[in-house]
Amino acid sequence: MATYISVFYSKFALLDKTNLANIKIMAQEDVFKKLVSHCKEYGFVFPSSEIYDGLGAVYDYGQYGVELKNNIKKYWWDSMTLLHENVVGIDSAIFMHPTIWKASGHVDAFNDPLIDNKDSKKRYRADVLIEDHLAKIEEKINKEVAKAAKKFGDAFDEAKFRETNPRVLEHQAKWNEIHARYSKDMNDSNFEDLRQLILDCEIVCPISGTRNWTDVRQFNLMFSTEMGSTADGAMKVYLRPETAQGIFVNFLNVQKTGRMKVPFGIAQIGKAFRNEIVARQFIFRMREFEQMEMQFFVKPGTELDWFKSWKATRLKWHKALGFGDDHYRYHDHDKLAHYANAATDIEFLMPFGFKEVEGIHSRTNFDLSQHEKFSGKNIKYFDPETNESYTPYVIETSIGVDRMFLSIMSASYCEETLDSGESRVVLKLPAALAPVKLAVMPLVKKDGLPEKAREIIDNLKFHFHCQYDEKDSIGKRYRRQDEIGTPLCITVDFQTVGDDKVEADNC
């Protein structure tokens, strides 16, 4: 059937100047609470094991959540492996030889600095307490700027205001002092002064409200288990804390079988596990999560140029989703991981502030060199153009799928107030990522309209994720599609049966 679709853009298609006034302005905390509630109510994310009262920081993705998540992964995978001829994929095992994690440094160095409040008996990451304190100072600065911008309007010079306003300068000096000391303590693993910094900043426990803190100590984040038939003969293995090492140990396998020449990349999507003590903010920080990582192997001496190149490429990829430049920023690292000589984060404006969604790192040749040392195998690359062997340097791009999911949901969530005063939720997801691409709805459940709607579904379901809906009024059905982010709805009416034309609407 050749169906002609005439498209009428609804007033809810875009957030333009005519309907911005109808958007309900909410505090960011309220937005986040409503978003979490919406995710559960409409089948995006559920607490795991909920009938058993759940399991901390573990979540399940519902029928629409899994579709959105799969679309995010496909969007990333295709951009890596289809748009770049020199990037290929791999799927390595979660369980790997335990010596891999010794070589990578995870056994000895994959730790978080923890501190307990003696009154509440609650445990916190010391670095997170300080970072939250810094964020509060930054928020004070931003409030001063926003207040001045409102007062002076178009004549407001933000840069000059930040350089001259006494209150802003006072807050900024305090921020700089704390941040410099914090960075030094973390770099030097000076946990005694890290605790003293928490005391000097008068940081209190959110539960007890007291400053009765223990000493700071290290806690390894890897989950371990045993592999083998008996306790005596079992081997201690780990649930991988990252997907990158599976790429590194397969470097030569992929390079030789794929006849790859440096520079080239290996991409992977997979689950990782970290025993986070302070897991929080819904799916932003979980103990079981999914990563999208690409390791790009380059000739030594070229790594910083490639780092800059991938840094720019990855930001463009994020901005292509259309949420606006003001939602993104770079955060260059003061403290570098033991394997890196350059690192930056792409941060996204979440309801709880700017947070990392992707990390780009120049990992040097640390990982390949370590695996060569611990395995005793030669993992060097022979360059046929220069007739030399060397250990490639690596540029890494790493995204948390769950964080990406949360960033997209938070940027897409809109609450509108209609002329009647009634409130409605519209999830303005990018069409390429929407769980359901097309909803087909007969105007009534008789006179051949349902059959015609089913015929349209049958013609389109192999190309798009479609949904048929005949329950309730046509207005309520449109609202349901708005709430799950469906970009296009087709209404089959009496005219459709006669001339094969349908009315379509951008939800």
List each language-model region with its residue ranges.
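Short hydrophobic alpha-helical segments enriched in small aliphatic residues
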Residues: 5-7, 13
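Short hydrophobic targeting helices and cationic amphipathic motifs
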Residues: 9-10, 20
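NTP/phosphate- and nucleic-acid-binding module
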Residues: 22-507
